[in-house]
Amino acid sequence: MLNLIVVVLPILAAVTWVVFNIQKPAREQLARQFDENNKAF
């Protein structure tokens, strides 16, 4: 059981880190797009 946790935890941390790093720039780009749309109106 402990062995499983030792293996799964770093994988889970890596996946979470990758997802967070991908979402961060995407969210900034989305916010920029909304700002441009608001200025257009």
UniProtKB/Swiss-Prot annotation:
Membrane among the record's keywords? yes
Residue spans crossing the bilayer: 4-22
InterPro entries on file: PSII_PsbY
Q: Which HAMAP family match?
A: PSII_PsbY (MF_00717)
What NCBIfam families does UniProt report for this protein, alphabetically? Answer: PRK13240.1
The entry sums up its family as follows: Belongs to the PsbY family.
Name of this chain's protein: Photosystem II reaction center protein Y
This chain is encoded by the gene named psbY
